[in-house]
């Protein structure tokens, strides 16, 4: 269930805690009013229904997920007089996952800003986790960092529903963690 890395291998994940955005149900985002059928249909998802084209999937899925994130931000913008107010369960999720979520989101924002290259190829101040450079980057990239947190929130919300359903039917789900 972890994000896949190079070659889409689950054993080359960048996180032992994060969920794979590939598993976010786009129809659920549509049902929540964050996507439209037209937005989903407009994307190219691959030519062969019997084979997964991960390159195409990556490009299309993240484009659609960014659209959903923009709609989510818009949906909650200005509520309670706040520029960025989100549902209570989002804050509960962020607090419960504080031990890894902020670093993961910062890492993914840095990875995106650096053309998805390995962290070993990033500018020195990021490779060595210079606190001032990271704080400056985080302040400048608040929306991008928020995107990666949103994906984890959506993944966790949907995963809990699947797991609860399976458990209610007497199905136990087992897995392993990449190390």
Give the ranges of each region predicted by the language model.
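Acidic/aromatic-lined carbohydrate-recognition and catalytic surfaces
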Residues: 1-179
């Amino acid at each position: 269930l972890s994000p896949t890395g190079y070659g889409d291998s689950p054993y080359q994940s960048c996180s032992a805690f994060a969920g794979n955005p590939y598993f976010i149900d786009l129809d659920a985002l549509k049902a929540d009013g964050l996507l439209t059928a037209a937005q989903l249909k407009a994307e190219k998802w691959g030519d062969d229904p019997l084979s997964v084209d991960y390159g195409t999937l990556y490009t299309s899925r993240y484009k659609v997920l960014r659209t959903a994130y923009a709609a989510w931000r818009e949906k909650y913008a200005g509520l309670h007089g706040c520029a960025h107010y989100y549902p209570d369960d989002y804050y509960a999720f962020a607090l419960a996952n504080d031990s890894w979520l902020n670093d993961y989101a910062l890492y993914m924002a840095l990875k995106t800003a650096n053309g998805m290259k390995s962290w070993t190829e990033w500018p020195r101040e990021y490779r060595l986790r210079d606190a001032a450079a990271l704080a400056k980057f985080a302040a400048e990239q608040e929306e991008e960092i928020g995107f990666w947190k949103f994906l984890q929130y959506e993944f966790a919300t949907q995963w809990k529903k699947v797991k609860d359903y399976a458990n209610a039917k007497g199905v136990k789900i087992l897995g392993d963690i990449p190390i």
